[in-house]
Amino acid sequence: MTDTTAPRTSGAVAAGLATIAADGTVLDTWFPAPELSDEPGPSGTERLTAEQAAELLGGGATAAVGPDARRGVEVVAVRTVISSLDEKPVDTHDVYLRLHLLSHRLVKPHGQSLDGIFAHLANVAWTSLGPVAVDDIEKVRLNARAEGLHLQVTSIDKFPRMTDYVAPKGVRIADADRVRLGAHLSAGTTVMHEGFVNFNAGTLGTSMVEGRISAGVVVGDGSDIGGGASTMGTLSGGGNVRIVIGERCLVGAEAGVGIALGDECVVEAGLYVTAGTRVTMPDGQVVKARELSGASNILFRRNSVTGTVEARPNNAVWGGLNEILHSHN
């Protein structure tokens, strides 16, 4: 069964560059090299001098900091400390450091507290020139046109795309817009064009992602989330049940799961198994799918004659991942 526990040290520390709007709102913070630490010190963020920034981030940091008149922001160098990852985030810099820890694969999903993060994240216009305050978009667009530039707004959201901050080794991402910062992608993972990975979610091994991995969902090694498939997350509707897809599982195209799957499970294409789905067992007994949550070696299928959802021993091998698609990431 997929191990979702995340051994880690108590806290974290990192130096980075933060974008500050004219009203003082922190739009983002980029931490190029976050680290876990046993004794990080008290939680908080301090601004760095130019000399400190050059020492901790490299010589290029000196040129990167300062006012950006085009976007109406200031870029500042900071050092953020989290004394304990079990404690909830205290500010925007803290949240961004935790998201970086996930995408740098230093912490697994659910391996730290993310309580209250939405309150610390501003709604930001993510553009081709960098993060911009939403109220300033048209002003920045005009500034760009005045310089012969075209401003492209890729999204207006609280979370940026991961690849603008972290590019994990050994993965393929066909459409970067569909992977949020805070996604955890293990080496060998391929995310195709229709795949999506939310924050505090992702893969723990080689996986094919052609469907949606919702917030809080973890997918085990060797599993395939088929085209258009869905996994129920822990955000919408106040859900708090963690969905774990075990190892060597197949969630077929346009299928979905609202329960945990053990290892070697298959959900046939087009079948959505929610916790309340009534499932007929091999002996004729009818149970709710939640009673099978986490069980291994099960084939979930819909009887094409009666329409009944059935659970059968998964004696057949679905073939596994195509090694050619994952061995050269």
UniProtKB/Swiss-Prot annotation:
<feature type="binding site">
    <location>
        <position position="288"/>
    </location>
    <ligand>
        <name>succinyl-CoA</name>
    </ligand>
</feature>
<keyword id="KW-0479">Metal-binding</keyword>
<feature type="binding site">
    <location>
        <begin position="301"/>
        <end position="304"/>
    </location>
    <ligand>
        <name>succinyl-CoA</name>
    </ligand>
</feature>
<comment type="function">
    <text>Catalyzes the conversion of the cyclic tetrahydrodipicolinate (THDP) into the acyclic N-succinyl-L-2-amino-6-oxopimelate using succinyl-CoA.</text>
</comment>
<comment type="pathway">
    <text>Amino-acid biosynthesis; L-lysine biosynthesis via DAP pathway; LL-2,6-diaminopimelate from (S)-tetrahydrodipicolinate (succinylase route): step 1/3.</text>
</comment>
<feature type="binding site">
    <location>
        <position position="194"/>
    </location>
    <ligand>
        <name>Mg(2+) 2</name>
    </ligand>
</feature>
<dbReference type="GO" id="GO:0009089">
    <property type="term" value="P:lysine biosynthetic process via diaminopimelate"/>
</dbReference>
<keyword id="KW-0457">Lysine biosynthesis</keyword>
<feature type="binding site">
    <location>
        <position position="227"/>
    </location>
    <ligand>
        <name>succinyl-CoA</name>
    </ligand>
</feature>
<dbReference type="InterPro" id="IPR032784">
    <property type="entry name" value="THDPS_M"/>
</dbReference>
<keyword id="KW-0460">Magnesium</keyword>
<feature type="binding site">
    <location>
        <position position="212"/>
    </location>
    <ligand>
        <name>succinyl-CoA</name>
    </ligand>
</feature>
<dbReference type="InterPro" id="IPR001451">
    <property type="entry name" value="Hexapep"/>
</dbReference>
<keyword id="KW-0028">Amino-acid biosynthesis</keyword>
<dbReference type="GO" id="GO:0019877">
    <property type="term" value="P:diaminopimelate biosynthetic process"/>
</dbReference>
<dbReference type="InterPro" id="IPR011004">
    <property type="entry name" value="Trimer_LpxA-like_sf"/>
</dbReference>
<dbReference type="GO" id="GO:0000287">
    <property type="term" value="F:magnesium ion binding"/>
</dbReference>
<feature type="binding site">
    <location>
        <position position="276"/>
    </location>
    <ligand>
        <name>succinyl-CoA</name>
    </ligand>
</feature>
<dbReference type="InterPro" id="IPR038361">
    <property type="entry name" value="THDPS_M_sf"/>
</dbReference>
<keyword id="KW-0963">Cytoplasm</keyword>
<comment type="subunit">
    <text>Homotrimer.</text>
</comment>
<dbReference type="Pfam" id="PF14789">
    <property type="entry name" value="THDPS_M"/>
</dbReference>
<dbReference type="Pfam" id="PF14602">
    <property type="entry name" value="Hexapep_2"/>
</dbReference>
<keyword id="KW-0808">Transferase</keyword>
<protein>
    <recommendedName>
        <fullName>2,3,4,5-tetrahydropyridine-2,6-dicarboxylate N-succinyltransferase</fullName>
        <ecNumber>2.3.1.117</ecNumber>
    </recommendedName>
</protein>
<feature type="binding site">
    <location>
        <position position="253"/>
    </location>
    <ligand>
        <name>succinyl-CoA</name>
    </ligand>
</feature>
<feature type="binding site">
    <location>
        <position position="230"/>
    </location>
    <ligand>
        <name>succinyl-CoA</name>
    </ligand>
</feature>
<feature type="binding site">
    <location>
        <position position="177"/>
    </location>
    <ligand>
        <name>Mg(2+) 1</name>
    </ligand>
</feature>
<keyword id="KW-0012">Acyltransferase</keyword>
<dbReference type="GO" id="GO:0005737">
    <property type="term" value="C:cytoplasm"/>
</dbReference>
<feature type="binding site">
    <location>
        <begin position="268"/>
        <end position="269"/>
    </location>
    <ligand>
        <name>succinyl-CoA</name>
    </ligand>
</feature>
<dbReference type="GO" id="GO:0008666">
    <property type="term" value="F:2,3,4,5-tetrahydropyridine-2,6-dicarboxylate N-succinyltransferase activity"/>
</dbReference>
<dbReference type="InterPro" id="IPR026586">
    <property type="entry name" value="Type2_DapD"/>
</dbReference>
<feature type="active site" description="Acyl-anhydride intermediate">
    <location>
        <position position="210"/>
    </location>
</feature>
<keyword id="KW-0220">Diaminopimelate biosynthesis</keyword>
<comment type="similarity">
    <text>Belongs to the type 2 tetrahydrodipicolinate N-succinyltransferase family.</text>
</comment>
<dbReference type="InterPro" id="IPR019875">
    <property type="entry name" value="DapD_actinobacteria"/>
</dbReference>
